[in-house]
Each structure stands twice: as C-alpha cells, then as structure tokens.
C-alpha cells in the first residue's frame, strides 16, 4: 500500500516531466505584443529540418496566438496543439513597444512570473517590428532565437554584448514598476540590427 501511494505521488507530482521529449516543442524565442484583439504571444521553434537535414517546407516554425489574456492564450495552445509547450529552453524574450506601456507590462510580468520554467537568465529585447523580426532568417537559416543567443554568448570575452536579462527586468519592476532600457532589434533588408545603446 505504501509503495502504491509513493507511485501515485511520483506520477502526479512529476508534471511535465512525464511528457516524453519527442512529444514536446522547445521554443528558443518568445515574443509578446498587443494587437486590437488583445495580447499576442509568438513562439519561435528551432529549425529542426536544418539540424536533421530533413526538409519540411509545410511546417511554420512560428506559432502565433492572440487572445484577451496570457493565461487564455496558453490554455488555447494546450487544447489545440499536439505537442507539450516546454519553455525551459527559452533563450530570448522579444517585446513590442505597446506591451512596454503601463497596464500591459503589468499583465506581462505577472504572466512571466507564474511560468516557473522560464529562467531569469533569458535575454530581453524590444522591437516595433515583431512580425518581421520573428520571420527573419539568418545566412545559415538560423532562427531569431538562435541568432540572438549567438550574439550574446558565442563571442570572445572582449566581443560579448551586455544584454538585459529577465532577472534585471524583474528587479527594476519590483523597485518602481518600470522596466530597464532594453536593447532594440529591427530588420533592415536582409539584416537583423541590434542596438545595445551604451552597453555595447
């Protein structure tokens, strides 16, 4: 009886750990914005066709959902998608200008804080071209998440950029309800530009 009780607790308490890796999707970048219909979340998946050599032209690596609040967006995603959304590998958070405004940013911070799998070392950027940024492809067909992660981490110590992490965002928001200055990204032709301001 004791063994059976332990088994039940283990299975019910494991949560997403019970979902096999092949039944998950792992967004590297999450975009958040505001539209006339409510809040927008964009999930950018890594391009597995490039990594495996298998072409899947019909698959869009960008999932976009728009609803009145973030919890509703996630609930709809979970009801409509065959794979579990695992945010534990998220590297980049990209915010449009509207969601940085008072009122919207409070809802965003509340949502992010209750997402226990999103790490505080995620880099945060802002843009007024959220759609263009998420559909941008690098020279080697890298996704936006892979590219920005590379800018931040795959450099020598003298070349590394000083990004802003989600931890810093939480800290300033807790202090005075505002957000720190965020590096800006935009698309110029085939290039993705990043402005780190005085932190470059």
Specify the residue positions occupied by each region the protein language model found:
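Membrane-proximal alpha-helical signals and transmembrane carboxylates
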Residues: 2-200
């Amino acid at each position: 009886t004791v063994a059976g009780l332990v088994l039940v607790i283990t299975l019910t308490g494991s949560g997403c750990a019970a979902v096999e890796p092949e039944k998950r999707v792992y967004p590297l970048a999450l975009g958040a914005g505001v539209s006339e219909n409510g809040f927008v979340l964009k999930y950018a998946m890594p391009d597995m066709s490039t990594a495996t050599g298998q072409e899947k032209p019909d698959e869009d690596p960008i999932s976009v959902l728009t609803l009145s609040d973030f919890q509703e967006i996630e609930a709809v995603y979970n009801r409509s998608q065959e794979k579990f959304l695992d945010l534990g590998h998220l590297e980049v958070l990209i915010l449009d200008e509207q969601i940085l405004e008072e009122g919207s940013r409070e809802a965003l911070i509340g949502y992010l804080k209750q997402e226990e799998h999103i790490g505080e070392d995620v880099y945060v950027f802002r843009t007024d071209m959220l759609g263009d940024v998420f559909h941008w492809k690098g020279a080697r067909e890298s996704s936006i998440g892979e590219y920005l992660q590379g800018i931040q981490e795959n450099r020598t110590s003298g070349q590394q950029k000083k990004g802003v992490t989600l931890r810093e965002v939480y800290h300033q928001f807790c202090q005075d309800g505002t957000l720190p200055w965020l590096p800006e990204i935009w698309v110029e032709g085939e290039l993705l530009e990043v402005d780190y301001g005085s932190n470059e």
